[in-house]
Amino acid sequence: MRVKEQLLTLRAYVPGKNIEEVKREYGLSKIVKLASNENPFGCSARVTEALTSLASQYALYPDGYAFELRTKIAEHLGVKAEQLLFGSGLDEVIQMISRALLHEGTNVVMANPTFSQYHHHAVIEGAEVREVSLKDGIHDLDAMLEQVDEKTKIVWICNPNNPTGTYVEKQKLLSFLESVPKSALVIMDEAYYEYAEAEDYPQTLPLLEKYENLMVLRTFSKAYGLAAFRIGYAIGDAKLIGQLEVARLPFNTSTVAQSVALAALEDQAFLQDCVQKNAEGLNQYYAFCKEYNVFYYPSQTNFIFLKLGIPGNEAFERLMKKGYIVRSGAAFGIDDGIRITVGLKEENDEIIELLKELVNEQVQKEETYS
């Protein structure tokens, strides 16, 4: 029995190391995980309240259409309910879209590096992947447009981008949308949308009416702090969304996930508090980078990508031995960088002290050999 040939060229997704794994491996009692861009402040207290009322529903199938959540999100965003497609996290939404649109003879266009699942599912479906290197850490939309042809089914734009935290400006996006063929679906993955505060960050939902080939992805895993429950969604042209529903598994979002998402959505005060504290945390890292002349990408997310002057894998290992889990840039093809999730203030302070040690050691080595 053999699987598709293209599956043999891929690896299963490898998430960041989990806390218990690192405790066992290094014999540590305290671990701070700053690797997976989770919300360090947790989730709204209303989520806990919602969970207590669900015990009587565990034996029942969930609402496959997610009617109540669909209605509330549509109202919150100012879109129509039939414009929404729900998935077990954005990973499943990406899988559904790829499954429905891609096949051998088609192609997708994306940046490199960016979120790996765009590439992963395109390969599984037999599509050609056309990757365009980031320019100064940002999507090079002009170069991406040059890669689009009549066989291009999807253009992926992760905005803000993972792993760099950078963003595409409004005017550049508008110019791209005016130029790209209507036969290509432009998907804006806005998993980190709530954290983006730049004045020229594009507000894409008002553009959906004009551009039928535009789709937007959002999630409850990041700023809302519901990563464990796996729920994300797409917003797009109602006709296309209806066609994509055919590729959706029955009952793909659980009753629990729908209920906690509803509860989280209703607590916008908690969300805004998290966003504010995240901005303060980013400023801690910016201050360190400027003082120690460390390269970094200004971030519109809850993480920062920086370069310490040593290999990312080395920084990753040394920080992990101290009880701090980050992501090595090698995982994204940037061997000399690391990605760090913004944590609690004291967590940021602690890891920044470790980063200072790494930088100082590297400076001393360079002085010794100079």
From Swiss-Prot:
KW Metal-binding (keyword) present: no
Cofactor: pyridoxal 5'-phosphate
Catalytic activity: L-histidinol phosphate + 2-oxoglutarate = 3-(imidazol-4-yl)-2-oxopropyl phosphate + L-glutamate
Pathway: Amino-acid biosynthesis; L-histidine biosynthesis; L-histidine from 5-phospho-alpha-D-ribose 1-diphosphate: step 7/9
Molecular-function GO term, any one: histidinol-phosphate transaminase activity
CDD domains: AAT_like (cd00609)
Pfam families: Aminotran_1_2 (PF00155)
Single GO biological process annotation from the record: L-histidine biosynthetic process
InterPro entries found in the cross-reference section: Aminotrans_II_pyridoxalP_BS (IPR001917), Aminotransferase_I/II_large (IPR004839), HisP_aminotrans (IPR005861), HistidinolP_aminotransfase (IPR050106), PyrdxlP-dep_Trfase (IPR015424), PyrdxlP-dep_Trfase_major (IPR015421), PyrdxlP-dep_Trfase_small (IPR015422)
Keywords: Amino-acid biosynthesis, Aminotransferase, Histidine biosynthesis, Pyridoxal phosphate, Transferase
Enzyme class of the recorded protein, top EC level: transferase
Top-rank lineage group of the source organism: Bacteria
Modified residues (N6-(pyridoxal phosphate)lysine): K222
Enzyme Commission number(s) of this protein: 2.6.1.9
Family of the protein in this entry: Belongs to the class-II pyridoxal-phosphate-dependent aminotransferase family. Histidinol-phosphate aminotransferase subfamily.
The protein's assembly and partners: Homodimer.
PANTHER family: HISTIDINOL-PHOSPHATE AMINOTRANSFERASE, HISTIDINOL-PHOSPHATE AMINOTRANSFERASE 2
Name of protein: Histidinol-phosphate aminotransferase 1
Source organism (scientific name): Bacillus cereus (strain ATCC 14579 / DSM 31 / CCUG 7414 / JCM 2152 / NBRC 15305 / NCIMB 9373 / NCTC 2599 / NRRL B-3711)
